[in-house]
């Protein structure tokens, strides 16, 4: 373990640094899933001073503040590390709530949007005269866990000294905890583990059900992508699986040349490459096109389905055309853009596991991989036989969980075994969890829908007045962004959330009295 003084230098930030073998998009290789987290509005993070509602000019909201948090909440003798947080007081009036977000598995300096009214956080603050905070998540591996992150939030809320008059502790002021994706799950887990610290909890696309085999990640894509594209993708995947699971080496070499230029990697590694074009679905938002964003997923489908000036029918063009078109698109986009200045086999499958032993600790991809390998799972695999699939069935728990974790952490895996997903669900409830004043919002088109409270694969989640569950026609955490109101169901849900929060805040004083009587 690093000495305490050095540890704090590493633990302050999630900023990834360049290391041998990384792709131009920061991933270790093409069979590592992109790390998606909180979505952002278009444009650079906001900077500069802001003006309070009373006309006072306040400090630059992009300036980070620093706060000491115990490295291990179970053994505080280990010392502390510095974490960064950002704050915006422009809407705050005495008595208003504190709207707090732990940004999860990211470098939080890019997430100051979440202390402005370009997000639901800021809209709540504007309506309720609240104070806005985003805090960076801890990053180092030995003490990187759900349980430690929950206590980080508690420790900050109970000990941070905010530059406003009055008592802003959670005993005297209502704190609203907001999170998305993993940090949305953390928000829900917080309600289960520490129900009386934060008054309101709001999880957007909260991935509350840990699953080792998460082939359902691709289900919302298959259900909602253009029918012709879906048909051709499924045809290509079925062909790739049939060939690679067979004995015709000539046919295998043909596929390897089409997608992997016959690089010296396994067939399952070649089959896994095709997910790269499918993964681009999660970059979509309701406003992507209108805001001039890149529609990479639809560019991929156009490459398959537009032949000259002719668009295929709903059943697609069929295997022969789709296979060649996909291979050509993959070569000129994914390989050409991501495998620059790197050996192709290394680009596809990474460097040997032993080279990962001394990897820098302040790497967000690796930090998040530690959490998935130890507590969540979520291997992005092919669907089982009998279920339609747009991903190769050669991608399994073996390739995408066991081998993946051993690649990143060879000193720990595979000896550790599978991720402790069942323990996580048992501890925090998964789909069965319930908490007072807990809001869930999920997207029907979100790749993470099947790990959320709106999963189609379960019927045990129930929306109630105290724990409302909304399903919008949006993507990953669309409800957090003000621009997403271009989609009517998102706009309606955002308005409902503002009304719900307002109603719950009106009950704050009576809640405090009830809590006092309980001796909490």
Segments predicted by a language model, with ranges:
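Classical eukaryotic N-terminal signal peptides for Sec-dependent ER targeting/secretion
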Residues: 1-12
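Catalytic-loop region of hydrolases
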Residues: 10, 14-134, 499, 503-520
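A catalytic-pocket lid/entrance helix-loop region that shapes and gates access to the active site
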Residues: 197-311, 319-322
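Loop/turn elements at helix/coil->beta-strand transitions in domains of secreted/extracellular proteins
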Residues: 95-99, 128-132, 172-174, 196-199, ...
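Short glycine-enriched nucleophile-adjacent loop
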Residues: 182-195, 201, 208
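Alpha/beta-hydrolase fold nucleophile elbow
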Residues: 166-181
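Active-site machinery of serine-nucleophile hydrolases
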Residues: 90, 97-98, 102-154, 369, ...
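C-terminal subdomain of alpha/beta-hydrolase-fold enzymes, centered on the catalytic histidine
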Residues: 276-519
């Amino acid at each position: 373990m690093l000495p305490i003084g050095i540890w704090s230098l590493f633990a302050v930030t999630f900023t990834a640094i360049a290391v041998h073998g990384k792709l131009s998009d920061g991933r270790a290789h093409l069979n590592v899933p992109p790390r998606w987290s909180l979505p952002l509005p278009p444009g650079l993070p906001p900077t500069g001073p802001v003006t309070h509602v009373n006309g006072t000019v306040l400090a630059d909201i992009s300036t980070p503040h620093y706060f000491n948090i115990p490295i291990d909440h179970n053994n505080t003798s280990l010392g502390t590390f510095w974490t960064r947080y950002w704050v915006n007081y422009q809407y705050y009036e005495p008595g208003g709530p504190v709207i707090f977000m732990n940004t999860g598995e990211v470098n939080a300096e890019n997430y100051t949007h979440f202390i402005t009214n370009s997000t639901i956080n800021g809209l709540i603050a504007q309506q309720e005269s609240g104070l806005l905070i985003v805090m960076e998540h801890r990053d180092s591996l030995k003490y990187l866990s759900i349980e430690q992150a929950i206590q980080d939030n508690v420790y900050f809320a109970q000990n941070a000294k905010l530059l406003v008059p009055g008592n802003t502790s959670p005993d005297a002021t209502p704190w609203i905890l907001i999170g998305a994706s993993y940090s949305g799950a953390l928000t829900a887990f917080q309600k289960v583990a520490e129900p009386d610290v934060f008054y309101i909890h709001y999880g957007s696309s909260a991935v509350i059900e840990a699953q080792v085999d998460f082939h359902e990640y691709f289900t919302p894509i298959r259900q909602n992508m253009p029918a012709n594209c879906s048909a051709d993708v499924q045809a290509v995947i079925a062909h790739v699986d049939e060939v690679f699971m067979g004995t015709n080496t000539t046919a295998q070499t043909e596929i390897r040349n089409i997608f992997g230029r016959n690089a010296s990697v396994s067939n399952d590694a070649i089959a896994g490459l095709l997910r790269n074009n499918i993964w681009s679905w999660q970059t979509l938002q309701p406003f992507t096109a209108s805001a001039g964003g890149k529609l990479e997923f639809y560019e991929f489908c156009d490459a398959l389905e537009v032949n000259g000036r002719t668009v295929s029918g709903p059943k697609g063009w069929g295997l022969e055309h789709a296979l060649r078109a996909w291979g050509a698109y993959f070569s000129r986009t994914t390989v050409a853009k991501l495998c620059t200045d790197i050996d192709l086999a290394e680009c596809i499958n990474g460097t040997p596991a032993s080279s990962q032993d001394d990897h820098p600790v302040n790497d967000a991809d690796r930090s998040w991989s530690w959490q998935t390998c130890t507590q969540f799972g979520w291997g992005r695999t092919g669907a089982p036989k009998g279920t339609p699939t747009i991903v190769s069935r050669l991608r399994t728990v073996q390739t995408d969980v066991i081998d993946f974790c051993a690649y990143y952490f060879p000193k720990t895996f595979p000896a550790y075994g599978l991720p402790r997903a069942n323990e996580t669900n048992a501890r925090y409830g998964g789909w069965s969890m319930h908490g007072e004043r807990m809001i869930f919002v999920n997207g029907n088109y979100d790749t993470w829908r099947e790990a959320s409270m709106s999963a189609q694969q379960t019927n045990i989640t129930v929306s109630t007045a105290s724990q409302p569950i909304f399903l919008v026609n949006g993507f990953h955490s669309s409800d957090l962004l003000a621009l997403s109101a271009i989609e009517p169901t998102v706009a309606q849900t955002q308005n409902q959330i503002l009304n719900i929060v307002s109603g719950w805040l009106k009950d704050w004083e009576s809640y405090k009295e009830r809590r006092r009587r309980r001796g909490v």
